[in-house]
Amino acid sequence: MSRSIWKGPFVDGYLLKKADAARASGRNETIKIWSRRSTILPQFVGLTFGVYNGAKHVPVYVSEDMVGHKFGEFSPTRTYYGHAADKKSKRR
């Protein structure tokens, strides 16, 4: 079930402050964040965020298409190695 409209999008407060500071400084630095649950807002477009996936910060450049999604969607936490091969079929 999606979030009700009257509540508005969820964004951690410190994230807004960091984004405003990055825009004011004009530098193109990666902003390290741990808040995977925060919604991407239009004011984040053009900034690069380092979204923590449990092991490292994955760089995510925010584009207009990402607005409304969560940061965690763009930083996978699990590594997929593929399905194990069947030993019988390998012998042939």
From Swiss-Prot:
GO BP: ribosomal small subunit assembly; translation
InterPro entries, per database record: Ribosomal_uS19, Ribosomal_uS19_bac-type, Ribosomal_uS19_SF
GO molecular function, one term: structural constituent of ribosome
Keywords from the UniProt entry: Ribonucleoprotein, Ribosomal protein, RNA-binding, rRNA-binding
GO CC list: cytoplasm; small ribosomal subunit
UniProt entry tagged with the keyword Ribosomal protein: yes
UniProt keyword rRNA-binding, yes or no: yes
Highest taxon above the source species: Bacteria
Homology family: Belongs to the universal ribosomal protein uS19 family.
Function: Protein S19 forms a complex with S13 that binds strongly to the 16S ribosomal RNA.
NCBIfam families: rpsS_bact
UniProt protein name: Small ribosomal subunit protein uS19
